[in-house]
Amino acid sequence: MSNKGQLLQDPFLNTLRREHVPVSIYLVNGIKLQGQIESFDQYVVLLKNTVTQMVYKHAISTVVPARPVTIQQQDGEGGN
């Protein structure tokens, strides 16, 4: 994965994780998963609801927070 992708994904997912924001995750096959992001790395997201599911990022189409969030960008990161 490109560094640019990580610069966008990591702050977004980390904010959702830290603030315990409920999310809906839509997979490329149309399935909707709901829960809170427990953890993530370069390849997977751990989504916690009644159980914890490991969801591969390549299977994710869209991540929709249940409420608006403000993403904290580190110095030097642009929004291009």
Swiss-Prot record:
CDD domains: Hfq (cd01716). Keywords: RNA-binding, Stress response. One of its GO terms (biological process) is regulation of DNA-templated transcription. GO terms for molecular function: RNA binding. Residues 10-69 form the Sm domain. InterPro entries: Hfq (IPR005001), LSM_dom_sf (IPR010920), Sm (IPR047575). The keyword Protease does not apply. It holds the Pfam family Hfq. GO terms for cellular component: cytosol. PANTHER family: RNA-BINDING PROTEIN HFQ (PTHR34772:SF1). Homohexamer. Belongs to the Hfq family. RNA chaperone that binds small regulatory RNA (sRNAs) and mRNAs to facilitate mRNA translational regulation in response to envelope stress, environmental stress and changes in metabolite concentrations. Also binds with high specificity to tRNAs. This is RNA-binding protein Hfq. It comes from Azoarcus sp. (strain BH72).
